[in-house]
Amino acid sequence: MTVMRCNDSIRGALGRLILLAIGALGASQQAFGQTTDVIVIRGHQQIVHLYGRRGGDPVIVSSGDGGWIHLGPHVAEALAAKGLFVVGFDAKAYLESYTSSGSTLQPADEPGDYRVLADYAARGSGRKPTLIGVSEGAGLSVLAATDPQTKAAIAGVIALGLPDTNELAWRWKDSLIYLTHGVPNEPTFSTAAIAGKVTPLPLAMIHSTHDEFVPVADVQHTLQQANEPKKLWIVNASDHRFSNNLRDFDQRLLEALDWIARNQPR
């Protein structure tokens, strides 16, 4: 009888612990986990991935052309855990939505699309969002920040693994670049050619020492073409997405956000 009462007590305690764990997990997911929403940009529905609570300092994280995987979600989760409100944007899906047999995304239209994103992200906070882009998303973020109206709606740009050549379309056949590490056979734009137009907004770049897609020399060249305020952090990491040194990457990312805040146009 004593053993049975003991077992019942243990089971009861375990049950309470499980319920507490489930509750804690639910609260964590509510605070930092991903939910989704749909916004309409020039007649096209775009799914956005939301992390954190609206009202925190807003950021827009644009993915690479692989979609909402790897570094983009990592950045979103890390920043939401610090209290920021993150709008995750799938650059691959965005490009696909404007790609047809006869047309692609036009550079003149892209900044206005990001202005819609910026207005959405800023809602409820009264603060301008920072654009954070991964690879292709970094190029799109730089392009958006060259437009005077969009500049007025954002705080600056943090470019992660920024390539010089960025595509303006995406088709299934373009996935070959993941093997070749080349550039899709699509219309493109050069970030080095437009980086100087981001000023007076601050432009930060974070790059891996062993980026297999974008050599350090390429991002240094783009930095040279940009005007102040500008800054480059280089992280000792094994690949394009900093996969073996996310700890240092995360620290540099927080430093870049602080630097953006301290270098706002006067």
Task: Map each language-model feature to its residues.
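Alpha/beta-hydrolase active-site loop
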Residues: 103-124
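Catalytic active-site module of serine/aspartate enzymes centered on a nucleophile-bearing elbow/loop
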Residues: 246-266
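Primarily recognizes the serine-hydrolase "nucleophile elbow" in alpha/beta-hydrolase
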Residues: 119-178, 186
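N-terminal cap/lid segment of alpha/beta-hydrolase-fold proteins
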Residues: 31-53
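Conserved alpha/beta-hydrolase "acid-adjacent" motif
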Residues: 212-218
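Histidine-bearing beta->alpha loop at or near hydrolase active sites
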Residues: 93, 235-242
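Short, surface-exposed "cap/lid" segments of acyl-processing enzymes
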Residues: 53-84, 88
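Short beta-strand/loop motif that positions the catalytic acidic residue
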Residues: 198-199, 205-207, 211
